[in-house]
From Swiss-Prot:
Gene3D superfamilies: Cytochrome c-like domain (1.10.760.10). Keywords: Acetylation, Electron transport, Heme, Iron, Metal-binding, Mitochondrion, Respiratory chain, Transport. Belongs to the cytochrome c family. GO terms for cellular component: mitochondrial intermembrane space. It holds the Pfam family Cytochrom_C. This is Cytochrome c. Heme c binds at residues 15, 18-19, 81. The keyword Heme applies. The modification N-acetylglycine is found at residue 2. Binds 1 heme c group covalently per subunit.
Length: 105
């Protein structure tokens, strides 16, 4: 899998303006991502999701994140996430490695 330190840099550059990862972190434009791995789409408590996110019904893990982060709007049409995605698979792997560590209990 990916490199956690490289993934942290990617998170800071591309994700942190809209997301937090720490336990009890605030929702911003996007939901707090703590507890992401193993959670179903559209389930962060207290965040207002689109119906598309709530109805997708997948569980976040390495494979689903790998596909989603390549092109969020293609994976969940109707998501309000405006991020275009990360085309390079090694960068997605690094980000996922960071998210697995940073968002776990």
């Amino acid at each position: 899998m990916g490199d956690v330190e490289k993934g942290k840099k990617i998170f800071v550059q591309k994700c942190a303006q809209c997301h937090t990862v720490e336990k009890g972190g605030k929702h911003k434009t996007g939901p707090n991502l703590h507890g992401l791995i193993g959670r179903k789409t559209g389930q962060a408590p207290g965040f207002s999701y689109t119906e598309a996110n709530k109805n997708k019904g997948i569980t976040w893990g390495e494979e689903t994140l790998m596909e989603y982060l390549e092109n969020p709007k293609k994976y969940i049409p109707g998501t309000k996430m405006i991020f275009a995605g990360i085309k390079k698979k090694p960068e997605r792997a690094d980000l996922i490695a960071y998210l697995k560590e940073a968002t776990s209990n």
